[in-house]
A protein has these predicted regions:
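Mature extracytoplasmic enzyme cores
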Residues: 1-196
Length: 196
């Protein structure tokens, strides 16, 4: 274990009493001591890409320099931290969707339930799982509202529980009402709260 945290609050104001210091292992920060015996303890760690040191990168700003959707998708794969849906378009009218964030390969488990570190389950932090992307779909339309966009073959890497798609269906229907959209019509869609 090593320690992390600080004994000061924002702007250097000292804390009276308890210090904000935690314990961290190669897995991540310690979040709970489940049981403790004389020589053995059962503990829980938080293993999350946002808590990895390499997640504090700012490569998302390279999207500002991407010249087309292909470059945008490539830049997005280097943007670590928690995964996010990323939808993009370029000046030529091409569109794309992908997922940002580091997606480690899971070895020996699918991520749907917590696993003990003592098992054979591991994360390969040196290699990423296959990253889904959709570029220039036949429909000519991309939309996402935390619903499943990628095929089921990506479920072991990114998860199996998605929004049921009510909001995404509404967005699809509103997009279909016009052949072309501008900033105002897209803002209207974003602010729409109806579900039909």
């Amino acid at each position: 274990f090593d320690t992390f945290g600080t004994k000061e609050r924002l702007r250097g104001a000292p804390i009276d009493g308890e210090a904000l210091v935690g314990l961290r292992s190669t897995l991540g920060p310690l979040v709970e001591v489940v049981s403790q015996e004389e020589e053995e303890a059962t503990v829980r760690f938080a293993v999350w890409t946002a808590l990895r040191p390499e997640s504090a990168n700012l490569t998302q700003f390279q999207l500002l320099e991407a010249k087309n959707v292909d470059e945008g998708v490539a830049v997005t794969s280097t943007w670590f931290g928690p995964s996010q849906n990323v939808v993009m378009a370029d000046a030529s009218g091409r569109i794309g969707w992908t997922i940002s964030g580091f997606i480690p390969k899971r070895l020996g488990f699918d991520g749907s339930t917590p696993v003990p570190w003592s098992s054979d389950c591991r994360w390969d932090w040196g290699a990423q799982a296959p990253r889904p992307s959709v570029v220039d779909p036949e429909s000519g339309v991309l939309f996402t509202a935390n619903n499943r966009v990628a095929g089921w073959e990506y479920a072991p890497a990114i998860g199996e529980n998605w929004d049921p798609g009510y909001r995404a269906s509404r967005i699809r229907d509103l997009l279909a009402q016009k052949q072309e959209h501008d900033e105002q019509s897209l803002l209207d869609i974003a602010l729409d709260t109806r579900v039909e």
